[in-house]
Amino acid sequence: MFYIPDSYLSSLIQEDLQFMDLTVMALGIENVPAKLSCFPKTDCTLAGVEEAARVLRLAGAEANVLLKSGTDAAGGSVCLQAEGSAGAIHGVYKLAQNIMEYSSAIATRTKALVTSAQAANPNTRVAVTRKNFPGTKALSLKAALAGGAGIHRLGLSDSILVFDQHRVMTDDFLTQIAQMKKDFPEKQIAAEAENAAEGLAYIAAGVDSLQCERVSPAELAQFVKEAKGINPQVTVLAAGGINSDNAAAYATAGADVLVTSWVYFGKPQDIKMSFSRG
């Protein structure tokens, strides 16, 4: 289960439907029976369908999910249907559409990246960062999971990842690695290196995961060879500019994990909302 509370979805409804739908009220159609069918116009990996259904239910309509999040849907395949008053459906249909369009786009981009990476190296995994647009973390992460990715970091509180901006505040990071492992025995210690020599030194000092930022696939391949020579169990992550076009190259280079924010940004999927009288 991926938990998204009703309170979050209700807050999204309230952003658009403050009190009433004035157009529906002016037309006098609030109580006219209505039906809604939703489908992607082109092939995609669906996401956000369950949340769209919940939004419709919160407004008082009945909603039925026909194709779940994570489904590779053909264009024109109906994924969600709803029935209820025109007032209920018109009040939230645009929000339901937005949730599915943005979520399905994230899932589709994620699926393309994962497919490319694992075709080149079945052992490589893809993980998404916390660099989603503020306020969209739950929907963004659920969509990325639907596309086959894992989660790099939920936030600052679930993992230890040391960047250069942390190290400039310390006297000697290398000497702190062993102490950090003692102080947090249930947590892996991860660090991002500025260059190969720095990364190898961190691995020799005991970090569990080493993140390589914006290195070429050729540079990464050489680094992986040297890193695994020091510690065969170390996890090497490639980050910075990872997308579906270069995922295969970085996977072939031997990255254990491809860390990406790319999936969050791009054109929404086109989801058609088809109305009829009930």
What do these predicted ranges mean?
Residues F2-E194, E198-A205, S209, A221, ...:
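Acidic/glycine-rich phosphate/pyrophosphate-binding loops and surrounding catalytic core
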Residues E213, N231-V236, G278:
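Short, structured secondary-structure boundary patches
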Residues R214, G240, S261-W262:
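Short secondary-structure boundary segments
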Residues S216, A227-K228, N243, A249-A251:
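Catalytic-pocket segment enriched in acidic/His residues
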Residues I242, A248-V257, S276-G278:
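Ligand-binding grooves and catalytic loops that recognize ribose/phosphate and carbohydrate rings
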Residues W262-G278:
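Short, charged, intrinsically disordered terminal tails
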